Amino acid sequence: MTPSLAPRRVILPVIYGIALLIAWEALAHSGAVSRLVLAGPLEIVVAGVRNWSELGFNAGVTLAQALIGAAIGNVAGLLVAICFVHWGFFRRAVFPLAILCEAIPVVAILPVLILWLGNGMAPKIFVAAFLSFFPMLVNAYRGLSNVDEEVRELLYSYSATASQMLWKVRMPAAVPFMFTALKLSACSSMIASLVAEWLASERGLGFLVVYYGQSYRVADIWSAAILSCLISLGLYGITAACERRALSRSSP
Amino acid sequence: MRGPALSLAFEGRRPWHWMGLDIVMLNAFPDEATRVRAATLPAGLYADGIDVVFRRGSHSVQALKDCSLDIPRGSWATLIGASGCGKSTLLRVFADIVKPTAGTALLHGVSPAEARANRIYALVQQGSTMLPWRSIIDNVALGLEISGLPKSTRYARAEEALALVGLKGFEKSLPSELSGGMRQRAAIARALTLRPRFLLMDEPFGALDEITRDRLHFELLRILEETGATLLLVTHSISEAVILSDKVIVMTPRPGRISEIIEVDFGRGRTPDLRGDPRFVQYEAQLRRALHQPA
Ligand SMILES: Nc1ncnc2c1ncn2[C@@H]1O[C@H](COP(=O)(O)OP(=O)(O)OP(=O)(O)O)[C@@H](O)[C@H]1O
Ligand SMILES: [Mg+2]
C-alpha cells in the first residue's frame, strides 16, 4: 500500500458508509417502511447499549462454540489432508466420500444432531467444525501436494524422510493455502454456531435472535445480528493479519 | 556385480567410514582372487547397457539406448549433445531418480539407490530450484539439515560454499531477490556443502555470464582436485566441455545413445591459459565434428 493511496482507500468507504447510515436513518423515520421490518441505526445502537451485558454473555457463548468448532474442524481437516498426501489409496477411497459428505446440508439435519448430541454446545460445535473441515481439507491438500517436481527430486536425492519432506517442504508450501481456509472458517464458524442455536438452545446470539423475534423486538434483533457480524469481521481481520505476518517473509 | 565383497566393504553405512575404503577392502579379503576382484571393481561412475524407456499409456519414448561408460574415480566427464538426447536422463539414472529399464549403473561399485541412501553424490539440477520461503543460506544448508548436522556446522559450511561461488553477503536474501545466475551459483554451493564423492551437475553454468562462468570453471576444478571427487556434468558448451573434462561423452538423439567418447588430455592443474593451448582448438574442432556427425 503506497502512502498516497492509503487515505483514499480508507476515506471513500467511510464516506459511503456514513451516507448509507444517514439514508437508512431517514428511511426508518420517514414511515415508508414499517417499524417491524426495519429499525433505524440509532435505535439499534441504543438497543445494543441497553442489552450490553445480555449480548456480551451470549456472544461469548456463540464465539466460544465457533472457536472450538473451527479449531477442531481445521485441525481435523489438516490431519486428514496430511494422510491424503502420504497414503494415496486412503485418499482415493476417502476423498469422494468426503466430497459427498460436504454436500450434506448440515443445517437441515440439525434436528438429528440435537437428538444425538443434546441441546448444549456440542451440536453447535459440531456444525462449526463440519463447515470448517472441508475448506481446510481441500485447501491444505492442494497446498501440501503443490510441491515442485525438482524440489521433490532434490529432497529425494538427499534421501529425506517423509516427515522431513512434510515439515521442511510441504507444510511451508501449504501455509498460504491454509490461510485461505482459515479465513473462510473465520466467517463460517460464527454463522454456523449462531444458526445451530436457532433450533434448540438456552444461550447464545442465535437463541437471543429467536427470543427477541418472538416478542417483535426488531431493534434488539438487529443489534444481535450486527454484533455477530462484527465478531466475524474481527476473526477475519485477526486471521488476515496473521497471514500477512506469516507470508511477509517469503513474498517481499 | 554386487557380491559379498561389497556388502563387507559397505558395512559402515556412513560416508566418513569409507574414507580408507580401498585399503580396508583389500585387507578384508584373505584370499588373493577376491582381493584382485575387489580391486578391479569400478570405483568411479560405471554404466553398462543402460536403456531407459518412458511409458505414458500406450505411448512410449526410448530416452536412452544401450549407454555404457566408465569414468574412473576422481576423473571428470561431461555429457554433450543436442537438446532431448537424454543427457539429463543419464545423469538422473546415476542419481537414482530415473530407474533404467535395463542395464547396470554403479557409483563406487554400488547401485544408485545405495549411493543415494549413503549420500555419496550431490546433484545440481537443471532448474536450480530453491525453496522460496527460505533465505539463501537456509537453502544452501538444506542438504546438511536433512543429514541432521548441527546448525553451527551447517552454517559454517554453507557460508564457506557461498563465499566460494561469490555470493558472500547474500546469505539472508530470498531466492526471489537473486538473479537467475546467482540462483544457479547458490545451487552449486548447495551441492558443494555436501562434500560429495560424486558431483552430478545438469547444466550448472547455463545462466552465467562469460566472466563468472570462467572463474567458476577453475574454482570447480580446484575443488574437484582437492577433494578427489568424480564429476559428471551436462553442458551445451563445447569449450566448457573441453575445459572441464578428461572425457567428453557425445550423445545423439532418437534414441539417446553415446556416439563417441573423446579423451581430453590436459591432466591436472588446469588454468585459464588452457584456452591459448593449440590442443584446445583441436579438441574443440574434434568435438564440433563429433556433434555434427549424422547419427
Ligand atoms: N519423465 C519423463 N517422462 C517422459 N519422457 C521423458 C521424461 N524425461 C525425459 N523424457 C524424454 O526423454 C528424452 C530425453 O530427455 P532429457 O531431459 O534427458 O534430454 P536432455 O538431453 O537433457 O535435453 P536438454 O538439453 O534439453 O536438457 C526426451 O525426448 C524427453 O521427452
Ligand atoms: Mg536436460
Name the predicted role of every residue range.
Chain B
Residues 37-47, 53-66:
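A short, flexible loop at the N-terminus of ABC-type nucleotide-binding domains that lies
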Residues 58, 111-125, 146, 151-155, ...:
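ABC ATPase NBD coupling module
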Residues 80-82:
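The feature captures the beta-strand-to-loop junction immediately N-terminal to the Walker
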Residues 95:
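Helix-to-loop junction immediately C-terminal to a conserved catalytic motif
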Residues 103-113:
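Conserved ABC transporter NBD signature motif
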Residues 134-142:
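Short coil-to-helix segment of the ABC ATPase nucleotide-binding domain corresponding to the Q-loop/switch region
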Residues 145, 152-170, 222:
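Conserved ABC ATPase "signature" region
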Residues 173-176, 194:
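Conserved signature/switch motifs of ABC ATPase nucleotide-binding domains
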